[in-house]
Regions:
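N-terminal glycine-rich phosphate-binding loop and ensuing alpha1 helix
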Residues: 2-59
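Residue-level signal for inorganic ion chemistry
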Residues: 6, 33, 90, 114, ...
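Short glycine-rich anion-binding loops that position phosphate/pyrophosphate groups of nucleotides
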Residues: 10-13, 56-57, 82, 115-118, ...
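Hydrophobic residues at beta-strand termini and immediately following loops
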Residues: 27, 76-77, 168
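Conserved N-terminal catalytic core of the sugar/cofactor nucleotidyltransferase
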Residues: 34-107, 187-189
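Short aromatic/hydrophobic "clamp" motif used to bind/position activated sugar donors
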Residues: 110
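Conserved core of the sugar-phosphate nucleotidyltransferase
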Residues: 119-194
């Protein structure tokens, strides 16, 4: 089973949106999150979608799902106080859904994706699933096109080669058993943001 876990619990503070969180901003007649959800909803290998959302915006999201005929969303849950907590809550909801379908965590692949990032392709989703099937996890990366500067502990600066540098993107995909175990271990160790 392949489940997209979409986190959309942010309030858009960095973007300074006052009227609504950025995932619900209108873009050509649709909230941004709907474009993201359509990508996963239309993908033939995605079985279900879980969304972690700002609790007060859940009714609005439910209305938009009906309006734009997004059919694979099986759970909408209140997001957490941080992106990390929203992801964990989404993973727990994905686990609950998979278990309700008698599918184990070992058999379940989750694709963790940000609700405000609709600019991915069907091929990216397919590649993530295939790579998890092959090696157990996959983080979408693109080649770095700008110069990166890394500050060392002694304040010295290092400029790594662009040819050797990549930018991590979403989705980030895993076998559910691995990522939920990592989250639970980190929480047990008192690490809330990792």
């Amino acid at each position: 089973m392949n489940i997209a876990v979409i986190f959309a619990g942010g309030s858009g503070l960095r973007m300074h949106t006052k009227s609504r969180p950025k995932q619900f901003l209108d873009l050509n007649g649709k909230p941004i999150i709907i474009y993201t959800l359509e990508l996963f909803d239309n993908h033939p290998n995605i079985d279900a979608i879980v969304v972690a959302c700002i609790e007060s915006w859940i009714p609005f999201l439910e209305k938009q799902l009906r309006k734009f005929e997004i059919n694979k969303v099986v759970k909408i849950i209140p997001g957490g106080k941080s992106g990390q907590e929203s992801i964990y809550k989404g993973l727990c909801a994905a686990e609950e859904y998979a278990q309700s379908k008698s599918v184990s965590n070992e058999e379940t692949i989750v694709l963790i994706h940000d609700g405000v990032r609709p600019l991915i392709t069907e091929e990216t989703i397919t590649d993530n699933i295939k790579k998890v099937e092959e090696v157990g996890s996959c983080i979408t990366c693109i080649p770095a096109t700008e110069t990166l500067i890394v500050k060392q502990a002694d304040d010295a600066l290092e400029i790594p080669s662009r040819a050797d540098s990549f930018i991590a993107r979403a989705p980030q995909s895993f076998r559910l058993i691995d990522i939920i175990t990592a989250h639970r271990r980190s929480l047990a160790e008192g690490k809330a943001d990792f």
